Amino acid sequence: MLFFEIIKAIIFGIVEGITEWLPISSTGHLILVEEFIHFNNANAAFTNMFNVVIQLGAILAVVVIYFDRLNPFKSGKTAREVQITWQLWAKVILSALPAAVIGLIFDDWLDAHFQNFFSVALMLILYGIAFIYVERRHQGVEPQVTHLVSLPYKTAFFIGLFQVLSLIPGTSRSGATILGGILLGTSRQVATEFTFFLGIPIMFGASLVKVLKFIVSGTILTGSQLFILLVAMLVAFAVSLYVIRFLTDYVKNHDFTFFGKYRIGLGILLLFYGLMKVLFG
């Protein structure tokens, strides 16, 4: 029944809206959810496309929240403010290039070799440990970059190199870029905010690639599948509006140690579940 499919789409949208922005891997959570919730008559092509395209809802929340800052054509902006906005976009595009190029070349290969329980679990655990280590190492260390406007182009580019690591499922795009930002001397606030903006070209691009591959495969998107996709995107958008604001406030007074511990716990859970599947089917 369509009603139950809508409920499933809502669940996926909630999971995506929460996990896309927190550094805990949306892929890891979606893989776990997919083990228990399946769309009726959904083939692998639709599922693969669905898991990426619902990110559009999440990224639209960033555009809505930060529209004034991201819009260089907003009336009332001074010449300096317009310049700052264009510089921000230049840094975002520069930072997005490495992941865009590597992703286009190796997308299918990465999905084929790393889209599984054990790879995702390993990445969850490794980066969980990394977060805890980096936060302890940086206790009492004053960040060099405390405002996004002063983020150097070189630092933005190197944050983009960290984003390449997130092409391996389970890493977390936000996790990789936030971790990279902290290691490169930015404050948690700057790293988090730049991560939001960096998601715009990357997630729009990734969604476009998946849609094109879906079309090229010759698979037909049914009306009910399109409706389910739109529902999930809308829910992801609504949830993201809250999560983005939550994380922005959270990092003002907290570090990412909790998320590191959470990642380790989830990774162990996925490893155990994956092992049980191998042993008992």
Curated annotation (Swiss-Prot):
Its primary localisation, in coarse terms, equals membrane
Q: Which UniProt keywords apply?
A: Antibiotic resistance, Cell membrane, Cell shape, Cell wall biogenesis/degradation, Hydrolase, Membrane, Peptidoglycan synthesis, Transmembrane, Transmembrane helix
Q: Which GO terms describe its cellular component?
A: plasma membrane
Q: Does this entry carry the keyword Plastid? A: no
Q: Which InterPro entries match?
A: UppP
Q: Where in the cell is it found?
A: Cell membrane
Report the sequence similarity comment from the record.
Belongs to the UppP family.
Protein's name in the database: Undecaprenyl-diphosphatase
Organism of origin: Streptococcus mutans serotype c (strain ATCC 700610 / UA159)
